[in-house]
């Protein structure tokens, strides 16, 4: 009897996929190298830790965990609708924004379609595209960011969805309001445009696009956001999309009824009103960003100016080697060769002492 091989049974798109490589956990490095103290600057998490208000709310929630969560997420959706000045029927909740991106692809894209995104953009875009069997169309980047003119020209009669990350991960590049608006004007309404704003809160308020307001004018626009970054809930998995109500209606037909658990629903609801926590997170990020960019400039290292909570630094052909050497110094960063950036490392902004640990290790290793 021939040996069973599940790979022979899957759809063609899945055959080409490789498992997503997340940032290395601190516990894994401690086990591997026997290190006591490890600094993780690999996954763009909030270094402040959990909001104290969230901690208190979660403790009160523990007694009810034998019950299923609210499948509709009424209270969280109501709060999000209020903040975004939309109806609750325009909100789709996700188990992190990755879940939202997958729901969008499964809802609108078939194996006969094409999906457009930028080179150096978030790896989940090609992942969800190929999983369906659709054709991924990666448009070459300009200055490490989206070439919106090139993306508009890449549209064909097979295009069904376009992903735009603003700010972009892993490069941190940012698209202006006028550039985005001009792009949306060029895209026909039968193509869904997903504006992934995972790092929205780190963008200065006077530079943020009124993306949710645009949905009235562009009903094919979907705005995706997450609680994993500035709101500090990466481990609880909470995200959402705002869209035209007819789009949200079909998304919620695909969405699993309990895709957000009770703790993530409560945490997301509470942290939205912890304004002091969010402000502190944004200020801490700005200070850390300044420290790292100054270090790069003093060290003669090129970097990509970033609007996120990370900095992608050009370290040369030995990027993978330097990554391994940093691991032995107890510092975890992110190699981005998989994003066609083999000479770069992405460094998350941490606490002041964590940023200093990275700088100290870099000075030791690079002389």
From Swiss-Prot:
User: Is Transferase among this UniProt entry's keywords?
Assistant: yes
User: Gene3D superfamilies per the record?
Assistant: Aspartate Aminotransferase, domain 1, Type I PLP-dependent aspartate aminotransferase-like (Major domain)
Which domain of life does the protein's organism represent? Bacteria
Residues with the modification N6-(pyridoxal phosphate)lysine, per the entry, are 229
Q: Does the keyword Transmembrane apply?
A: no
Q: Name one GO biological process term.
A: L-histidine biosynthetic process
Q: In which pathway does it act?
A: Amino-acid biosynthesis; L-histidine biosynthesis; L-histidine from 5-phospho-alpha-D-ribose 1-diphosphate: step 7/9
This enzyme catalyses:
L-histidinol phosphate + 2-oxoglutarate = 3-(imidazol-4-yl)-2-oxopropyl phosphate + L-glutamate
Cofactor requirements of the protein:
pyridoxal 5'-phosphate
Relate the assembly described in the record. Homodimer.
The similarity comment for this entry is: Belongs to the class-II pyridoxal-phosphate-dependent aminotransferase family. Histidinol-phosphate aminotransferase subfamily.
Q: What's the protein called, per UniProt? A: Histidinol-phosphate aminotransferase 1
Q: Which organism is it from?
A: Idiomarina loihiensis (strain ATCC BAA-735 / DSM 15497 / L2-TR)
Q: Give me the gene this protein comes from.
A: hisC1
